[in-house]
UniProtKB/Swiss-Prot annotation:
Pfam families linked: DUF1054
Organism encoding this protein: Leuconostoc citreum (strain KM20)
Source superkingdom: Bacteria
HAMAP family, A to Z: UPF0637
Similarity comment: family membership: Belongs to the UPF0637 family.
Segment forming the signal sequence: none
Protein name: UPF0637 protein LCK_01372
Taxon lineage: Bacteria, Bacillati, Bacillota, Bacilli, Lactobacillales
Length: 200
């Protein structure tokens, strides 16, 4: 078990300092714990992988509505390449394979072609998987091939758009004492790995 239901209480704190203190003391250690499990799995592809825990350094007034750890084969950063993210909102934990707007415009044409090439594998993902078009907005839709194709098209044509696919674990799932999130997280990474190999 990585996360617990009580961890979500961090988002009840409405001040910037209070929430940041909670993120640093409660959630970030969970991300560090998760990295010890995930990095060996990712490194099976022969690359050196690194964990990047969100710092929220640009926040001056409003507290962050979500926080995350990103995994990428680059020590300096992750936003300019396809990467994995495990994050937390006030109502769920998410595990995504992410292609974000920072890749534009330099890599737009290349990554769009790669995402299009991966669509058949996307179609085989579990029906429980979701699609997000903005990692900073708590809004998703079912990961259908139609939704995926539209998201890729929007990514190609719109400056502020992203493609994130994966699994959400709802806060309510943690109410069950026997629930084990580690298994779901690991299984999601494994399910997304073949797609990553195409779009990386």
């Amino acid at each position: 078990m990585i996360f617990k239901q009580e961890d979500f209480k961090v988002f009840d704190e409405q001040t910037l300092d209070g929430r940041m203190q909670g993120i640093r003391s409660v959630i970030d250690p969970k991300f560090e714990q998760l990295a010890k499990v995930i990095l060996p799995l990712l490194s099976e592809d022969g690359q050196a992988w690194y964990a990047h825990i969100a710092k929220h350094l640009r926040r001056t007034t409003n507290p962050p509505e979500n926080t995350w750890v990103a995994f990428a084969p680059n020590k300096r950063g992750y936003k300019m390449m396809p990467h994995y993210e495990v994050g937390m909102w006030d109502d769920h934990v998410y595990i995504y394979l992410a292609v974000e707007e920072n890749m534009k415009p330099v890599s737009t044409q290349k990554i769009v072609a790669q995402m299009t090439k991966a669509r058949e594998l996307v179609a085989r993902l579990p029906a429980t998987f979701t699609l997000s078009q903005d990692h900073m907005v708590n809004k998703t839709e079912p990961l259908t091939l139609t939704h995926y194709d539209l998201a890729v098209q929007k990514f190609a044509e719109t400056k502020h758009s992203e493609v994130l696919i994966g699994l959400q674990i709802m806060k309510s799932d943690y109410e069950t004492l026997s629930f084990e999130d580690t298994n779901h997280i690991m299984a999601t990474f494994k399910a997304l790995r073949a797609i990553y190999e195409i779009i990386k």
